Every structure is written in structure tokens, then in C-alpha cells.
Amino acid sequence: MATTIARIGSANWAKLLVLLWLVQLATAGEPNPACKTLPTVDKDNEDKCCDVPEMFPNETLNACMEEHQQSSKPPLQKSCEITTCVLKKQSLIKSDNTVDKDKIKSYIKEMVKGSDEWKTLVEKAVLEECLPLMDKDPSNVLSKLKSSLGDCDPAPALTIACAAAKFYVNCPAKDRTKSPMCDEWRTFLSKCSNSLEDLNAIFMVLENQKTR
């Protein structure tokens, strides 16, 4: 799981699911019922649903993986720490562990390896859609999640998971794969990536599938 937390640059539909596993919330509000049933998952299909540009340098990803991957901590906590590590190494998190919105905006313009259309999409997803979700949090799910993550603040990792879903939903036509599976997932994520409760519902379904 942790290997793909920050590798949005080459993400396909399966990697998006891995990102959404970050959203393990102890308790939450009521999700959209439609988010409790996942679309078709073809594990043998490696087609990309969206060709997302590189977001973070490989050397940063590898350094954070080496630093945290071999830890004996629970997988969810390691994933949170790896994501936070990547953002810190890129100077995108303040000393109080909150995401630095001004630096995020500059980073997108200077470092994201994509077209202007992609940079606009990333900026909107992170700054206008996902970070505000963290601020709203009517069910206090972030504070409930912290109890299972040690000293790792879940908000940065949740922001990454949320943004990945938005990238898939709004993927530019030239970078989009047209297939029944991809179309089904885009429709699903357009409904189920707008609240922490909905993201949690996706996680719970995935966890149930893993234990079968």
C-alpha cells in the first residue's frame, strides 16, 4: 500500500484504490449509500484510466519509502508517515503540520510535470475541493482517525487521496482511457469523493473484500 501513496504520476485505477485505503475512520457520519458498492474491479487489467503527470520527484518518494517502509508500525500509519514525509521534503507542510497553501500553489506551477490544463486541475482539486473538506469535517472524523495513527496527522494524506479521485473524475480528454471499467469508476468517484464519510464508505468496502 505505502509504495503507491505518493506515486500519483503513474497512477491507474488500482493505485487510486490504494490511496483511498488511507481513509480508515473509526466512526463517521452517514455516507451516500451508492458509495458502499464498488464498480467492477479487474485486477488483471493494467490499462490506465487517466495518464496523470508526475507530481513528486522519484528521489523524494524513494527516500521516504526507505525511511518508513520497514517500520513495524501498522500499514495505515506507515502510509500516513510516508505521505507526510514526501510533502515535508518538498516544503509543502508548515511547522504545525498543516498544508502550506501558498507553497502548494507555487509548487504546482513550477514542479508538476504537466500541461497548463493539468496544473489548473491539480490546483482546483487540492486548494478548492480537498483542503476545504479537511476544514469542514462536520463529523470530526479527522480527530477520530488520529487515535489510530500515532503522532501522524491524517489531513495531508487524506488530501492526497481526495485529490487523486478528483484527477480521475476530471481527467482531460487527451489523457483519458475510454473503457467500460474506467467510465464506471469515473461515474462512481464523481459521486463518492465529495465528503470524508463517502471516502470512508469506499474504504470499508475494500477492507471487507480483502478479508474474504
Swiss-Prot record:
A GO BP annotation: sensory perception of smell
Domain of life, source organism: Eukaryota
Stretch forming the signal peptide: 1-28
InterPro entries to which the protein is assigned, alphabetical: OBP47-like_dom, Odorant-binding_protein, PBP_GOBP_sf
Keyword terms, alphabetized: Disulfide bond, Olfaction, Secreted, Sensory transduction, Signal, Transport
Principal location listed in the UniProt entry: secreted
Subcellular location: Secreted
Disulfide cross-links: C64-C85, C80-C152, C130-C162
GO CC annotations on file: extracellular region
Pfam family, any one: OBP47_like
GO molecular function: odorant binding
Similarity-based family: Belongs to the PBP/GOBP family.
Role, per record: Present in the aqueous fluid surrounding olfactory sensory dendrites and are thought to aid in the capture and transport of hydrophobic odorants into and through this fluid.
Protein name: General odorant-binding protein 68
Taxonomic path: Eukaryota, Metazoa, Ecdysozoa, Arthropoda, Hexapoda
